[in-house]
């Protein structure tokens, strides 16, 4: 389910007041503006969600304008907002077919209030200046944490803003939701690329490359690497080896498997998640640095795996890193993924105008 309906007992309207069955007089809420922002790594369908939010808001009598934060929460802090109301319905509809983050994204995590009260006060200033009553934050786990913090702080500050988290992550690692918008399209890209690359390697394996290593995203969750298994068929044995973050890397067993596969099939296709790690928890590709979210910066696991194979087995290899290609491949997006990306955006607006707060839309 993507939405819900709340029953009420309002039966008539008089002089800008709602009269319910218990004769309570409730002033009608004035329509407010909304802010939508994108955060973290983008996808080929995140703009489909943006399209849904804007289209649903335009149909609601409780929302006037929808502003978009340029470069995510950073744009809101800098009061660098995009007024989407000046765009035609036709222009907004084009978002459904555009990969990347059309409004810009960021990797900026709000600290706890006691560590960065200045930022929270700045958000209140911007919200007040633009009559914001709704905040939609489209992102992964860190983004949902930000949405929760803003909802709590605005409430405590006496300027409550309805905050709704909209899921987006190609890693498919958010809790509660069955799957995450963005994942399906990347899974399709990886499975297709794995099958195509396998056919290439197989055709040259007699006299050239024996091993192909394909690196995909997925720091702590192996959903993307595992999706390469969809390439397997009766006539295609690749991928022969999939290295997941959840399964500790054992070099001895790995090398034996590579030799066994080549002996049997003549070539070996390996798909490895960027988060593949040793038993002690150290990433194979640990670069020794961290990103702006405090996560370890990974330096590329495919060349590391290739190095191990070359050093221990002396086999000719090629490796590839799908990197941004996998998450921006709109030309091969999954229709189910597109449908879900639109549905969660539409549901976010429905939840917000019905009075829900601190909610994460889930599938």
Predicted regions span which residues?
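Short, positively charged and aromatic/hydrophobic N-terminal segments
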Residues: 2-25
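Short glycine/serine/threonine-rich phosphate/pyrophosphate-binding segments
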Residues: 43-53, 76-77, 120-121, 141-149, ...
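Short, ordered loop/turn segments at secondary-structure junctions
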Residues: 39-41, 69-74, 107-108, 140-141, ...
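Glycine-rich oxoanion-binding loops at beta->alpha junctions
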Residues: 79-133, 142-143, 188, 195
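N-terminal phosphate-binding or glycine-rich loops at protein starts, especially the Walker A/P-loop
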Residues: 29-80
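Conserved small/polar residues in nucleotide/adenosyl-binding loops
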Residues: 361-363
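Accessory alpha-helical/coil subdomains and C-terminal extensions
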Residues: 66, 126, 137-139, 147-160, ...
């Amino acid at each position: 389910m993507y939405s819900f309906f709340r029953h009420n007992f309002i039966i008539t309207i008089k002089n800008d007041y709602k009269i319910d069955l218990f004769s309570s007089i409730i002033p009608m809420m004035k329509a407010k503006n909304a802010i939508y922002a994108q955060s973290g790594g983008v996808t080929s369908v995140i703009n489909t969600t943006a399209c849904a939010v804007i289209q649903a808001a335009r149909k609601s009598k409780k929302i006037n304008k929808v502003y978009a934060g340029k470069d995510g929460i950073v744009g809101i802090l800098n009061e660098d907002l995009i007024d989407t109301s000046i765009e035609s319905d036709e222009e907004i509809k084009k978002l459904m077919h555009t990969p990347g983050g059309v409004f810009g994204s960021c990797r900026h995590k709000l600290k706890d209030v006691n560590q960065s009260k200045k930022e929270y006060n700045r958000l209140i200033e911007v919200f007040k200046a633009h009559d914001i009553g709704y905040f939609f934050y489209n992102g992964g786990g860190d983004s949902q944490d930000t949405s929760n913090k803003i909802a709590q702080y605005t409430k405590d500050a006496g300027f409550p803003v309805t905050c709704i988290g909209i899921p987006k992550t190609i890693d498919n690692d958010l809790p509660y939701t069955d799957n995450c918008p963005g994942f399906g399209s990347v899974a399709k890209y990886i499975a297709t690329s794995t099958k195509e690359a396998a056919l290439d390697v197989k055709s040259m394996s007699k006299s050239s490359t024996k091993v192909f290593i394909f690196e995909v995203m997925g720091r702590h969750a192996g959903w993307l690497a595992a999706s390469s298994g969809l390439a397997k068929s009766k006539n295609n044995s690749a991928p022969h080896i999939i290295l997941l973050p959840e399964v500790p890397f054992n070099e001895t067993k790995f090398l034996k498997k590579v030799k066994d596969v080549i002996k049997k099939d003549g070539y070996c296709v390996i798909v490895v998640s960027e988060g593949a790690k040793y038993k002690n928890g150290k990433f194979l590709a640990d670069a020794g640095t961290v990103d702006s979210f405090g996560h370890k910066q990974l330096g590329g696991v495919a060349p590391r795996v290739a190095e191990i194979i070359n050093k221990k087995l002396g086999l000719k290899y090629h490796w590839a890193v799908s990197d941004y290609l996998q998450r921006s491949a709109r030309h091969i997006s999954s229709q189910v993924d597109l449908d879900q990306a639109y549905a969660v955006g539409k549901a976010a607006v429905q939840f917000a105008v019905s009075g829900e707060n601190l909610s994460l839309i889930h599938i």
